[in-house]
Design a protein with these regions (language model features):
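Catalytic PLP-binding core of fold-type I/II PLP enzymes
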Residues: 1
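Receiver (REC) domain switch/active-site residues of two-component response regulators
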Residues: 4
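Active-site C-terminal subdomain of aminotransferase-like
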Residues: 8-113
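Conserved C-terminal alpha-helix-loop-beta "cap" of PLP-dependent enzymes
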Residues: 84-181
């Protein structure tokens, strides 16, 4: 198993919930160098990079990421156990080995799914007073609902829930900077 080149977002797990922008590229040195020249300019490559007071967030995010990810995993396990205890279907099961932070939760109706996502939003530290509505999103055949009252826009390491409004009605719960949340 391996890859010649990979790329990712720092507003996800590696940023520890602190990086507000940024990404990373890793892999074979020759390919990383080509990416660096494509992202900047020939002759500049990786010699220039992040600035404007972003480096502290990146470094602190990398430092905090292992703890933040462990908190999020604990939250996903707790979510699965709690919802299964009241008869809901989740995947993975709370005792399953995990390879991701995403916890899927299945509902009988679209209304139940929307209500669940609204409760996630209501428990969020940012924009808790908003009620998410299913809406069209490019790339999806069906309307999508997204609950994400996050400090960093697009950050799925923070507590979020989203999914397309179609059978099987499944919301994908992600993140949680802290287990307590």
């Amino acid at each position: 198993v391996g890859a010649d080149l990979l790329a990712g977002s720092l507003i996800k797990n590696p940023g520890g919930g602190l990086a507000k922008i940024g990404g990373y590229i890793a892999g074979r040195a020759d390919l990383v160098e080509k990416c660096a020249y494509r992202m900047t300019a020939p002759g500049i490559g990786a010699e220039a990079g992040a600035s404007l007071n972003t480096l502290a967030d990146f470094y602190q995010g990398f430092f905090m990421a292992p703890h933040t990810v462990s908190q999020s995993l604990k939250g996903a396990i707790f979510t699965a156990a709690m919802l299964e205890a009241v008869g809901m279907t989740t995947s993975p099961h709370y005792t399953d080995q995990r390879t991701d932070l995403i916890q899927s939760v299945s509902f009988q109706t679209a209304e139940q799914m929307v209500a669940f996502c609204r409760e996630i939003q209501a428990a969020s530290p940012i924009n808790a007073h908003f009620a998410p509505e299913p809406a069209y999103m490019p790339g999806y055949e069906d309307d999508v609902i997204m609950a994400a009252g996050t400090f960093v826009q697009g950050s799925s390491i923070e507590l979020t829930a989203d999914g397309p409004i179609r059978p099987p009605y499944t919301a994908f719960v992600q993140g949680g900077l802290t287990y307590e949340h």
